[in-house]
Amino acid sequence: MYRYETHLHTSPVSACARKTVRENLEFYRDIGYAGVFITNHFLDGNFAARNDESMSYEDKIRFYCSDFEEGEKLAKEIGIDVFFGVELSYKGTDFLVYGLGKDWFLSHPEIMDMKKSDELRFMTSEGAFIVQAHPFREKSYIDHVRLFPRCVHGVEVINASLGEFENRMADYYAGAYGLCRTAGSDNHSAGNAKRLAGVEFETPLRDVADYAARVRAGEGRLFTVDRTEEAVSMRRD
């Protein structure tokens, strides 16, 4: 089976990430993963240059994409596939966006002024595959749970950083609305993470579009890895 990390943050682009691109790629290669999706916090979230007024929108996008571009360059050397994704944010409610690239974001600065639901619908119309990340996460900075079932294709029903209750509610949400199910680690610290989650397939992914198509077709299996016990637990077939 070919395992993939679908939700990963790297330093320096994500302000809260603790490990570099190289450190992450080497970690995932060493534990047998076939690939990772780098999904750093976008300009509307915990992006390292979010409040840098000296940078234009275009400059911020170029910096934002720099971690992924580094990953692309390192991929062959390290021996792991690297794919591009984005994590959008709205008051602590987050969305994983796959299928749009650097040129697209450079061409659409207007997204920064859009209402979030309009932004998600626009991205969908442009070919994006969108997953609501950890929809039932509760934190002090999140005023209340917000659901966007009409604006997303899928739900992250296993987030390795959350507990059973929050993930179970996410799974119910996906089932109630007939949305795709995904899993991811939301990893900010590479090998320091105590638990991982992802999606595995019988054959390797060709590209991001292939990932989206397979998930929408119900292919792939969600898994978790409990690193505290060095055990692997298959959570969904």
Regions found by a protein language model. Give the residues of each.
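Mobile, glycine- and charge-enriched loop segments
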Residues: M1-C16, L120-G127
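Charged catalytic cores and adjacent phosphate/nucleic-acid-binding surfaces used
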Residues: M1-T6, T10-S11, V21-E26, K91-W104, ...
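Active-site flanking residues adjacent to catalytic metal/cofactor-binding acidic residues
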Residues: T6, T39, V86, A133, ...
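Ser/Thr-glycine-rich phosphate-binding loops at phosphate-binding pockets of nucleotides
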Residues: T10-S11, G35-N40, D44
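Short, solvent-exposed loop/turn segments at secondary-structure boundaries
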Residues: S14-K19, S107-E110
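Catalytic domains of carbohydrate-active enzymes, especially glycoside hydrolases
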Residues: E23-T39
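A short helix->loop->beta-strand "cap" motif at the edges of active sites that frequently abuts
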Residues: Y33, I80, Y177-L179
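Extended substrate/RNA-proximal surfaces in nucleic-acid metabolism proteins
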Residues: F42-E156, S161-L162, R216, G220-T224
